Structures are given as structure tokens and as C-alpha cells.
Amino acid sequence: MSIISDIYAREVLDSRGNPTVEVELYTEAGAMGRGIVPSGASTGEHEAVELRDGDKSRFMGKGVTKAVDNVNNIIAKEIIGYDVTDQRAIDQAMIDLDGTPNKGKLGANAILGVSLAAARAAADELGQPLYNYLGGFNGHVLPTPMMNVINGGKHANNKVDFQEFMIMPVGAKSVTEAIRMGSETFHNLKNLLNEKGYSTAVGDEGGFAPDLKNNEEPFEILVEAIKNAGYVPGKDVAIAFDCASSEFYNADTKKYELVGDGKEYTAEEFVSLLESIVDKYPVVSIEDPLDENEWEDWQMATERLGKKVQLVGDDLFVTNTDYLAKGIKMGVGNSILIKLNQIGTLTETVEAVEMAKQAGYTAVISHRSGETEDTTIADLVVALNAGQIKTGSMSRGERIAKYNQLMRIEDQLGKTSEYKGIHSFYNLDEDARMAIVNK
């Protein structure tokens, strides 16, 4: 047995300069693991609770000293003495200690910090890379990246309502090549925006946040940038986007209010708008196309779009197996976005990925807009053979850290590694995948 001997938490900063929780966990044998917790800007209302102090005299109320104290004074007393390799028991003990359905007592940020630190300490104790510890000998699939290169919505101050416009190097032969293709497209996009007189300042996730005219212009510019980089839109590099529709949905009027277009849409009209975009551009994935509480509208959208493109539930599912099970039963979406801090433990995260796979849904392992230098998600996506990762643009150190880790892992795995590209979309049939590639 490898016994946990000490746990210590502190307040550090995320990529937005806001406080977050960092946890260090030690074993009797001298192993150590560190976990830093991310945070989101647009959050689903059903997410696990991120405990903040609310003291306006510190960090404008965003301090996390309560969560830190909960680790040091409550969680540590319970978890010290556990076998560090017994991840499921450690996570369950913290869930029981909290005793609430949304981790509102101790804070998901406190619990997740310990969960991540325990996994890293166990890997350190065993002398294994984290992806190898989490996935065993089977973890070998490098993910197709979703690279957020144009920001809108809550991630930027501009007229674009949709939150993220992403490129996916589906035609690459390896993740290293995919990252190169993404970088080249990113830099060609920057040159193109400069030529058009747009700002090339970047948003929270490292993508550009130009003040574009409407919600369609980003697609036009992305296609041009992909071509300028020497690639074929669709065949080499496809497009994904995140509507984050709950952010512009009016629950009283049941309308989607797009400021960039100066229009309001019913659910049916909005899905028709999305259909027109899918028909016109090489789109492979749409995230949160409808409001997180409108399940029947999601059903309608899935019937109309689910055979053509990946439909990812983020705010809809919030990495929660209860919501995912409901979605699977109703035939809602065909993919889940996996964010560790939405649910709060590594164990529950893995359970959500497994449930998705068993139902034929893809699982996209994701960062948050408030990120850190922690690279756990890069190891996790390989460990689980999830096949897709969403971890920001080709700028900002906290995003690049994940890409660098993926390239290290691919290098370590050597010839046993696999990059699936367009075939990572196993939720679409071959005809749908080829339609995107040949668009």
C-alpha cells in the first residue's frame, strides 16, 4: 500500500488572474502530486458548485480561501491514511463527506483539487506517466484537437453571438502534424484579420476576438484562412463551433436573440439557421446549439442535424451521468463535453466518458476559459482513448501547455500511438464523415 501522508491546499491564480485552488498531496514513500482547478466563464446552471468567498474586499469576491480551508481542515483529515492508488475510494469519501448533490458544502473546486493531486501522486509513486497510470496499456489514441481560433459571446467583447469558432485538423496523420496545421492556420488567420483591418487581440482562450459584422463572417474568414495556409477546408481542416445558446436565449419569450444579426429566432427557426450554416460550410461539430433546459427542442435539433454533424452537449449535460442518461434515453445530441470541474472528481468524469461511449456518443475532453498550467486533461484524453480534445487556441501558455504535453505523449508512445482524425467522429456514419471531408 502507498499511504497518503499529507495534503495541503493554497490559493493561486488562473489564466484570467482570478483565484483558484491548488492542492499538493504526499505519500509516505515520498511521492507527490499537484492539481490545479480551472473555472468557466459561461457555466451551466446545473454544474457542481465552485465555492467562492464572496468577500468583496479580496479579489472582488472571487477568493477561494473557504475552499482552501475545506481541503486543509476537513478533507485532509478524512483522506490522509488512504491508499493513494485507490482513486475511486478517495473520490467517494469526499463525495460522502460533502453530502450534497452538487458538492455545495465543500466546493467542487476543493474536491477536484484533491482528486487530481491524488492521481498524480499515484502515478509518481509508481513511476508511470499519468496517461499510463489512468489508462493502463490501452491508452494510445491521440485526440483530434478543437482549436478555438475566433472568440465571441462571453469570451470576447464583440458583435459575434456564438462563443467559439474552432478548427479541427481532421486530415492530419498525427497529433503533432495536427498541431502544426492548426498553428499554420492560426497564423494565416492573424494575417488575414490584419489585412481586413480587424483587431488581432486575443480572448480568454487564445483565439482572436475581432469585431466582425455578424455571426456568419467568422465562417467565411476561417475558410479563407484554411486555404491561405495551404489546406483544403473539410478534407484537411474542418470547422466546429460553440453556440453557447443559453447565453442569448430568452426563456420568457422562448426566442434566441442574436445581437450580431439583429434578429430573434424561435427554436425551429434557429435550427434552420444552423442547418444553412452546416450546408454551406465544412462544419463537423456544433456545441450547445439550443438552451440547456429545452430538452424537446434538442430532440428536434438532433432529428434534423444529428446525422450530419456532431451535436455536443455542454451546458445540457454538465459532465453529469444523470443528465447524460436522460439525454441518451430521449435521443438528445450525440456527444458530451467533458469538463472535470463540472462534476468535481476524476472518478465521476471517467464514468461519464464510459457511459457516453457505451451509447455511441463521443466524449470531448475540455478545458475551461479560466485555465491553468495543469496538463491533466492531455493525459486523460489519451488514457481514455476519448479521441477529441478542446483546449483552446495556438496562443497563451496555459493552452499551449496541453498541446506540448500531447506531443510528448505521442513521442513516448511512438509507433503504438494512433491519431484518428475524421474517424474520431464515430457518432457519424461514413457517408456523413465523407460529406464533410468533400464539402
Curated annotation (Swiss-Prot):
GO terms for cellular component: cell surface; extracellular region; phosphopyruvate hydratase complex. It is found in: Cytoplasm; Secreted; Cell surface. Binds a second Mg(2+) ion via substrate during catalysis. Mg(2+) binds at residues 242, 287, 314. Pathway: Carbohydrate degradation; glycolysis; pyruvate from D-glyceraldehyde 3-phosphate: step 4/5. The active site is at 205 (proton donor), 339 (proton acceptor). Keywords: Cytoplasm, Glycolysis, Lyase, Magnesium, Metal-binding, Secreted. GO terms for biological process: glycolytic process. Its EC number is 4.2.1.11. It comes from the Bacteria. SUPFAM superfamilies: Enolase C-terminal domain-like, Enolase N-terminal domain-like. Its cofactor is Mg(2+). It catalyses: (2R)-2-phosphoglycerate = phosphoenolpyruvate + H2O. Its main location: cytoplasm. InterPro entries: Enolase, Enolase-like_C_sf, Enolase-like_N, Enolase_C, Enolase_CS, Enolase_N. (2R)-2-phosphoglycerate binds at residues 163, 339, 368-369, 390. One of its GO terms (molecular function) is phosphopyruvate hydratase activity. PROSITE patterns: ENOLASE. HAMAP family: Enolase. PANTHER family: ENOLASE (PTHR11902:SF1). Belongs to the enolase family. Catalyzes the reversible conversion of 2-phosphoglycerate (2-PG) into phosphoenolpyruvate (PEP). It is essential for the degradation of carbohydrates via glycolysis. NCBIfam families: eno. This is Enolase. It comes from Levilactobacillus brevis (strain ATCC 367 / BCRC 12310 / CIP 105137 / JCM 1170 / LMG 11437 / NCIMB 947 / NCTC 947).
